[in-house]
Amino acid sequence: AKVKKSEYAWVAKTLNNQEFALFSKQPLAEQRHAIDVALEIYNQQNLVKSLYGIDQYNNLLKAALLHDCGKSLIKYRLRHRVIIVLTRYLPEKYKNNLIKHRTALGRILLLDNLHPKWGRHLAAKAGANIDIQKLILNHHNPSNQVEQLLAKYDNKH
């Protein structure tokens, strides 16, 4: 995964200094993913602004860049990432059973389940507004159209 200097400049312009520091703590693969998600929103900006307004567009863009920042608290290995992707479509009941019985697979799934909460907390500490925090918190369980848009592009990349 690579990030161009021009992309870092765009991210730095989009986020405040504390948010950019938080973005920069993410592994390179997460930074690339976050930029790809944010670019989807950027490329749809006219539609997003007309549907939800400029403030929500800006919140969505920032949330896209920071939505997985909670993962920066954990050292994910490649095999962990593969497991998470492969188990994404397992029924929740089955995943919860693995977590409940403290299996090795369950531990990986638990950490993945917690990253939105950790991300919300880190974003709050970085000065992100409550709407951005909620977008980060709910990016795997969207409850409104704006959250669904973030989830859609997150799942695409």
What residues fall within each predicted segment?
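Non-catalytic interface/linker regions that flank or bridge core catalytic/transmembrane domains
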Residues: 1-22, 142, 157
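Divalent metal-dependent catalytic cores for phosphoryl transfer on phosphate-bearing substrates
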Residues: 20-157
